[in-house]
A protein has these predicted regions:
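Active-site lid/adjacent beta-loop-alpha segment flanking the redox-cofactor pocket in flavoenzymes
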Residues: 65-195
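Short beta-strand segments that buttress and anchor functional surface loops
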Residues: 14-19, 202
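Flavin (primarily FAD) binding-site architecture
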Residues: 33-48
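Core beta-strand elements of the Rossmann-like FAD/NAD(P) dinucleotide-binding domain
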Residues: 20-30
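C-terminal lid/capping helical subdomain adjacent to the catalytic/cofactor pocket in oxidative enzymes
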Residues: 192-258
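A conserved short coil-to-beta-strand element within the FAD-binding core of flavoproteins
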Residues: 1-13
Length: 258
């Protein structure tokens, strides 16, 4: 674990790494911050305050022994808001408590799923980020106790045949992590004001798709290689541009993300 960074008048000089029993110092002129949801904490080691925040994104895995969902379907996404399917009796119970009444309200779009595993697998992976308020990252992530039930009901609204599993799906496996994002949902890639320091982060909801190109762009910055014409679009210094600040007024943290 990086516990400290040595910075002199010429920029980065060393990195301190803490192990379970001891600590070592590595002499270096380059330091890349690619700490995912801990981008802010890592930046603070060199006095940087990155304009990022984190959203908690979860997923569930459950079995489909009845074969409601064909194994060869692609990733499927529901793009309309919806209300969760409940029986009249369930509605009455939920309506009777301030703690559960929100489950009767309209939920945002975005529930999606795909089959997981090879031949013989019955596993379905499903995701729905219906709560996108910023959160401080903790490990392990803590999910809403009702998350799995809500996702399954959202899928039943999308695929009515899945309603056979409501209340009968056993205990779905819940996992997930954080989306680190900037205000306009555009990554940070490039050099920092501290000489020798670089950042690659805030890849948000398209990290898998953008990671290869992001890594190549970062490598060009670090090695001093030729940069593509779009490189300035990802620099931290973009926030110093008055015209860019005006653009931010019409963008939000879901830009470019399903």
């Amino acid at each position: 674990r990086v516990s400290g960074v040595g910075v002199g008048k010429g920029g980065i000089e060393s990195v301190q790494v803490a192990g379970e029993k001891d600590q070592m110092e590595i002499s270096t002129r380059s330091f890349v911050i690619a700490a995912g949801p801990l981008l802010k904490q890592a930046g603070a080691l060199i006095g940087m305050d990155f304009p990022v925040f984190n959203e908690l994104h979860g997923k569930i895995a459950f079995n489909d022994p009845r074969g409601v969902i064909p194994r060869d379907v692609p990733l499927m996404i529901w793009t309309d808001p919806m209300k969760l399917p409940w029986t009249e009796e369930e509605r009455e119970v939920l309506e009777g408590s301030d703690n559960t009444r929100w489950l009767l309200e309209e939920f945002p779009s975005g529930v999606h799923f795909r089959p997981e595993g090879g031949e013989g697998s019955q596993t379905i992976l499903a995701l729905w980020t219906y709560d996108i308020k910023p959160q401080e990252p903790v490990w392990p992530p803590v999910f809403d106790p009702e998350y799995a039930e809500i996702v399954l009901r959202g899928m039943a609204g999308m695929i009515p045949g899945l309603s056979v599993y409501l209340g009968k799906a056993g205990k779905p496996f819940v996992d997930g992590g954080y989306y680190c994002k900037t205000q306009e949902n555009r990554p940070l890639i490039g050099p920092l004001p501290v000489r020798g320091a670089f950042v690659m982060g805030a890849l948000s909801g398209f990290g898998i798709m953008a990671s290869l190109a992001a890594g190549e762009l970062l490598g060009n910055h670090v090695s001093g290689s030729a940069l593509p014409d779009y490189a300035p679009a990802f620099l931290l210094s973009r926030y110093e541009d008055p015209e860019y600040k005006k653009l931010l007024q019409s963008w939000d943290a879901t830009s470019g993300q399903l």
